[in-house]
């Protein structure tokens, strides 16, 4: 596997830390050891997160190509767009963000706080759009790029989740390399890796990275899209492309994509009771915050799997904490009583 041939622009502090979730593990019976790799604190750029890791492999193209405006898209409380705005500010570029109405959640402050507030503070041109949720290429995003061109700018396209970019999966191939180095220091290997999966490139890159040591099917994606067949197909497609790019040396097949579909309901961006219980439990036992859209759902999945005995006794499970905490402010009503 060859990742070194790709240019990388450092945006993170270095390897994100791996920390034990001792109290959560004990609360769940102590038969499974839980750990977290903290992508939620991987960078000093506006709280960082998994997209910051991905952008390290997209930014060189933007710089080398003389682009002056980063153009991206997400929901109103998109973590992606906040991280793109931060990177644009860091690089001295302009930023245009399309924020679509992906979540059926009504709150007077939803489009004024959290991620979107930070993007505005960082100087991004934020454009609200009424279109609903989907994980594909969006007309509103294409229009934003055309607008930049018409005004004399040179737009660099960054799709939702970085996922449709050919290099969108590279950052999480590197994640797997980091984990292997950290495993040497820890003196053991993780039996399973749990990750939230929506637009696909985080899961796909991780799958390819761990396929290098035979653990592709030990990467358990927790669907949060509530459109699992679209997500599954996108993970597979991105993983196959990424495997070729890094010269993995073997084909990625549909059997390599493990996607648990039990925890996304009722729909994208809306938590269920299990999501909220997982958010509170992890916060109160570990002081680790997760959000209702992504990490609360993957945390719910991991907790439920431990409770159900789905991990063999003695397993060491790594939870990939991808970020997302700034969105909590937009859901403050749900937590008004704690």
Curated annotation (Swiss-Prot):
GO molecular function: 1-aminocyclopropane-1-carboxylate deaminase activity; D-cysteine desulfhydrase activity; pyridoxal phosphate binding
Coiled-coil regions, chain positions: none
NCBIfam families assigned: ACC_deam
Pfam annotation, one family: PALP
InterPro entries: ACCD_DCysDesulf, ACP_carboxylate_deaminase, ACP_carboxylate_deaminase_bac, TrpB-like_PALP, TrpB-like_PALP_sf
Protein family: Belongs to the ACC deaminase/D-cysteine desulfhydrase family.
Domain of life: Bacteria
Sequence positions bearing N6-(pyridoxal phosphate)lysine: 51
Stated name of the protein: 1-aminocyclopropane-1-carboxylate deaminase
UniProt keywords, alphabetically: Hydrolase, Pyridoxal phosphate
Enzyme class: hydrolase
Stated role: Catalyzes a cyclopropane ring-opening reaction, the irreversible conversion of 1-aminocyclopropane-1-carboxylate (ACC) to ammonia and alpha-ketobutyrate. Allows growth on ACC as a nitrogen source.
Swiss-Prot/TrEMBL GO biological process terms: 1-aminocyclopropane-1-carboxylate metabolic process; amine catabolic process
Catalysed reaction equations from the record: 1-aminocyclopropane-1-carboxylate + H2O = 2-oxobutanoate + NH4(+)
Assigned EC number: 3.5.99.7
Active site residues according to the UniProt entry: 78
Subunit structure: Homotrimer.
Cofactor(s) listed in the protein's UniProt record: pyridoxal 5'-phosphate
PANTHER family hit by this protein: 1-AMINOCYCLOPROPANE-1-CARBOXYLATE DEAMINASE-RELATED
Keyword presence, Hydrolase: yes
